[in-house]
UniProtKB/Swiss-Prot annotation:
One of its GO terms (molecular function) is toxin activity. This is Cupiennin-3d. Expressed by the venom gland. Its main location: secreted. Belongs to the cationic peptide 04 (cupiennin) family. 03 subfamily. It is found in: Secreted. The keyword Secreted applies. Pfam families: Cu. GO terms for biological process: defense response to bacterium. Keywords: Amidation, Secreted, Toxin. InterPro entries: Cupiennin.
Length: 27
């Protein structure tokens, strides 16, 4: 259903944001 899709997208976004934050902290 829609809930599963939303959870999947939320996980993807969280991973991407985590990567961006890690990059900024390394600089």
């Amino acid at each position: 259903g829609f809930g599963a899709l939303f959870k999947f997208l939320a996980k993807k976004v969280a991973k991407t944001v985590a990567k961006q934050v890690a990059k900024k902290q390394m600089e």
